[in-house]
Amino acid sequence: MPAFKSRIESALADRKAQGLNRSINVVFSGNQSILECEGRRYINFSSNDYLGLANDQALVRAWQQGLSVYGSGSGASPMVTGFSAAHSNLEAALTEWLGYERAILFGSGFSANQALLLTLLEKSDVLIQDRLNHASLMEAGMLSPAKMKRFKHNDIAHLNSLLSSEDNHLVVTEGVFSMDGDCAPLADIAEVTSSHDAWFAVDDAHGIGVLGESGGGSCELAKVKPELLIVTFGKAFGMSGAAILCDHATGDFLTQFARHHVYSTAIPPAQAYALTHAVSMIQEQSWRREKLTELNEAYRDGLQDLDGFVETQTSIKPFMIGESELALQVASACRQNGIWVTAIRPPTVPKGTSRLRITLTANHTNEQIKTLSMALKQALGAL
């Protein structure tokens, strides 16, 4: 048997034996609070569409308007003919809103994170990351020529001990951690990095749009401005793509040397057109964030007495189970009661910390939270 085939079959068999096999579910209802799968309807508590913009008709119309003007695709790299007025307007809207000189667009958050670290870092640099950072950041750190260190999750003292004034450091954290829903102590990290003359980068995929007075995210809430800010459009924006916010020189550097940017087809101009509308909607429609605050309170009131409850100030609500098989059982029992929640297992989270990753969106209702609470109580009682 060829080595590749043997290796593939062995890896798949091991994954199944450990109870960690994953499958793809085909849904028919789009990204909404109610989803349809295999002929059944569920209340969807697994969507990252935090502000409920993905199916907002104003945003759908903006997509349609963009399509009528620009067609379906960009047709080229941004460095050739793929950068339209729609892309330029989106970059301008982002920089004005978030207070940076440049915004460089990418097709995904994964791509943006990889591009940033692989382009910026050299062998003489030291990269210091929170140990719970996203896989895209960790992989990029391992692939980069820099020396990578990891500090204990949100541990400022440990971070400080890893910094020195002699080395060229880049410190990277998420603003909101995707599996735990907790926030990084950004003000403290900014103070420590500044004292060591280090650069600071924040991946705010899950904070942008949701936190801060204008929806400016974790950094707006903490009143900090890192040298580098990564925002993604696949969560609160209701679409996909990402941008790196930075100063003029760094923006020019990424434009010239970031291979993910130079050698990729630009995102569709109609998408950029719609994203520009989303930027305005996020800032102007604060009622969406207010609705999330209300739902957070309803979630706490309904579930705080259950073993596994974890309180967060964000839309991400980890419900801790422990073992992978138990997490799958609870998720399955919830689905039998019309609740779609996803069991998160290793290697996404550390062994022994499997959980349900519950997410709230502005399209949910208090009544749906009550239904979730009852389904969880019933599922846990059956273990």
Swiss-Prot record:
Uppermost EC category: transferase
Entry's Gene Ontology BP terms: biotin biosynthetic process
EC number(s) recorded for this UniProt protein: 2.3.1.47
Annotated residues for binding of substrate: 22, 134, 348
Leader sequence segment: none
Reactions mediated catalytically: 6-carboxyhexanoyl-[ACP] + L-alanine + H(+) = (8S)-8-amino-7-oxononanoate + holo-[ACP] + CO2
Annotated keywords: Biotin biosynthesis, Pyridoxal phosphate, Transferase
Pathway listed: Cofactor biosynthesis; biotin biosynthesis
InterPro entries (alphabetical): Aminotrans_II_pyridoxalP_BS, Aminotransferase_I/II_large, AON_synthase_class-II, AONS_Archaea/Proteobacteria, AONS_Proteobacteria, PyrdxlP-dep_Trfase, PyrdxlP-dep_Trfase_major, PyrdxlP-dep_Trfase_small
Listed cofactors: pyridoxal 5'-phosphate
GO MF annotation terms: 8-amino-7-oxononanoate synthase activity; pyridoxal phosphate binding
Any one Pfam family match given in the protein's UniProt record, by short name: Aminotran_1_2
Residues modified to N6-(pyridoxal phosphate)lysine: 235
UniProt function note: Catalyzes the decarboxylative condensation of pimeloyl-[acyl-carrier protein] and L-alanine to produce 8-amino-7-oxononanoate (AON), [acyl-carrier protein], and carbon dioxide.
Protein name: 8-amino-7-oxononanoate synthase
Source organism of this protein record: Vibrio campbellii (strain ATCC BAA-1116)
The organism's taxonomic lineage, starting at the top: Bacteria, Pseudomonadati, Pseudomonadota, Gammaproteobacteria, Vibrionales
